[in-house]
Amino acid sequence: MSVAAAVSLALGTAQLAAAASARPMADASSARAANGASGGHAGAMIVPPSNMLQQIVVTASAEARNNLQTSEQVTTIPSKLIVAMAPRSIAEMLRLIPGVSVQDQAGSGGNANFTVRGLPVTTGGAPFVQIQEDGLPQVLFGDMNFGNNDYWTRFDVSEQMQATVGGSAATLAAGAPGAVINFISATGRHKSGEFTLSQGLGFGETKATFAVGGPINSTWRYHIDGFYVHGTGLRDQGFIGENGYQLKGNVTHDLAGHKGFIRLYAKLLNDREEYNAGGPVSAAGNGDTLSNISVYPGFDVRTGTTVGIYNQTITYLSNVSGQFGQARNDGIHPHVDSLGAELYYVPTGNLSVDDKFRVSKISGTFAAQFFGLGNTASVIGSTVNGQTVGQVVYAGGPNAGQAYNGLLNNSTQIYTNMHNMGNVVNDLSLQDHWRTPYGKLTAGGGIFYMSQTIDQSWHPNAQLQALSGTNPQSLDLISTTGQLLSSNGVTGYNTAWGASVDRRYNMNATDTAPYLDLTWGIDRLQLQGSVRQDDYRVTGWAESASAATTQVGYLSGGMLSATGGLGTPLVSYSTIDPNTYEPLDYGISYRSWSVGALYMLNSSTSVYVRASRGGKPNTDRNILSGYTNPNGSLNSSGAGKALDIVLQQEAGIKHEGDFLGGSYGVTLSYFHTSFSESSFDLTQPVATRYFNERYSANGGEFEATWAVGGFSLYTQATYQDPKVDSNEVGPSPSQLTSLGSGFLPPGMSKLMWVLAPTYRWRAVTGGLVWQGQSQQNIGGPVPFYSPAQDFLDGFVSYDLNRSISVALHVNNVFNSLGVGGGGAVTTGPGVVGVSAEPGRTVLASVTMKF
């Protein structure tokens, strides 16, 4: 978590209302009109009041209500100055949300694995969570291979982040039965301007962030924000690892007579961020549990990296043309150009119409050196490219040609080209309400449409490196007869995960989803229900290499041939086999629902219950798995694996009041979730790559704020008891074997918490953020547990005058060694391969307001 998160939390809670007063059920239409906000189910730009229970809920909500009067778990990271926050990745920011579990993080560019309420991340990404910007999803699926939803979003200059966990997320968003997280932009209602320049102290990052906006005249207003970042990054690769920008803006025309508004949006994102692949730690093992974790000599996972000056580029083999190319080994590099519009209109009375539209041109690349712990003893004597390995030597660098012994990184060097990940999305909704002798009835409904392209080509090379966290050198293999078996450490081009993972596909998924929401309220009681019908259509094609198109050859001068000498690298390689062509032409339909009831015990306390059912389609992760017929339709096996259903039940209490001269707000909830899944994870060993599993979880969430004078406190905690109810894995869908049940799912912890006190005295503000988690299963299908861990962050800021302030942020103050993950764990004698949290970083910044 970013230490500077406490800045925003402090600003949002430092001036809580002195006392709670009686409040009627919120009038949604008047709230929207007063704020010039969108009236749809997921994206109004409303600046919330400081008390967390009085913040207006607009995310996955058909009607704008304050949190106290909402029958589900909602968190809003307070508005104003999210721009002043300094999280090192989106993953650190999401840890502020109760119920959200961030299993690991791969750097500031995204690719984090995160989920909610004990639902497992079995394949990667965020399969149950939709990330939105201003009420519309960035991409249709949160767990696309090399296209997770956190690739395309940067949060530096959002006005606020709001999350709805469970409940209506199942019905008022696409494929998000777990949660909807919405990054909401400022819209220029108030004149403001701010520029921040930050500099890493001890690590290479310089970043400039700005935001400016305000009224143009009585009916027009605007907001523009953005950033530029440049440097070597948190983990010094020896070359520029961070370089990019985002520019985002909107202009709003308010209609006469408070009839609504018309708004235009634009966004440009071109940002290159380093990728953290993990590394080794020294540890003792006690059965399935790690202990005594410490830094492995030569590779500190807090600062080390698998990328350096000796592998700044990746040589890849086009799996279509068979020609070699060069790509920068530059982590995650997204390009997003978006244009959007919104019309919110109140034609008469209480009737409102809201239509949000956006078209996005999206592409990018993913380049990384993954980590897999191995040793020379297991490599020497093995068969590689048809010959027996006799020696391991340095491929280049200062030790070129010298023999290498000991542990090594035997993993995948991958370059994925995301040719086209663009989409078009539109959400049209209507709402009206009527007051009757029997209470107030609010009816809303609409239709959601989104078309998502997924066009990618993969190039996974098998590559070996020396085990070093600073400028690791590649390792070559030499056979017992003196034949060179690799080129700069690469033993195979496109062959790292087997021929079927050398793939090329171009597919399109559309979702057409009408939805309906009804709310009835009388006196202190509110009943709410919503239903959604999602109809997906998947078309396109996929193809891969095969054993028939996988061979060995001699590599010389960028050409492959059948003959060569001992000093010419003999490598394996694969290209696409046209006979693997798989047409895609099928539909997925399902119905989601959510029902809830809320009762106001008094003006400051509410209780609620809710149940929901939602779905998550599987699209690109199910291709080339034998799930389709020759005409592209789903066969009987594929029909059972194209959709996963999540069931949730929850109950909670929300309360606000006064304590010791200050004001507080607190929420407490209980939840139960259940889920089953059949899918495929290419990063697992071949023997456990396909799986069919069932899960369930019980748990509770707690969130509270308290403020008195210059002191404020934000805290949240989640306890969950997720279990694997059944667990079948195997090398193919027809070869599954049970591995048992009853254990903690991969990547999961039972307890997670955040405690963030802040104090302001005159011109000085300081604070701490303490966050941690209990024991975590960092293994794959076979459990392997890391110990509990916690981190302390701190910050201090000083106002030089009314316009200029300086700040110092320290993340991971004690440089704690924290490990995570949820994938395959590789082990050696006293050594374990893990993903890891970044070590201590210090960031200085200066902010000017104008």
PLM segments and residue spans:
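N-terminal Sec signal peptide and the immediately downstream disordered periplasmic leader
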Residues: 1-87, 91-95, 677, 695, ...
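Gram-negative outer-membrane beta-barrel transporters
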Residues: 27, 524, 659-683, 690-781, ...
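Extracytoplasmic beta-strand/coil segments of soluble accessory domains associated
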Residues: 44-45, 59, 63-66, 91, ...
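N-terminal periplasmic accessory domains that precede
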Residues: 90-93, 113-117, 129-132, 148-151, ...
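Short acidic/polar hinge/loop motifs at secondary-structure boundaries
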Residues: 136-165
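Short strand-turn segments of transmembrane beta-barrel domains in outer membranes
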Residues: 167, 179-215, 225-238, 769
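Acidic/polar loop-and-plug regions of large Gram-negative outer-membrane beta-barrel proteins
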Residues: 247, 252-254, 261-342, 365-419, ...
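Structural signature of Gram-negative outer-membrane beta-barrels, strongest in the C-terminal barrel
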Residues: 421, 440-484, 497-673, 718, ...
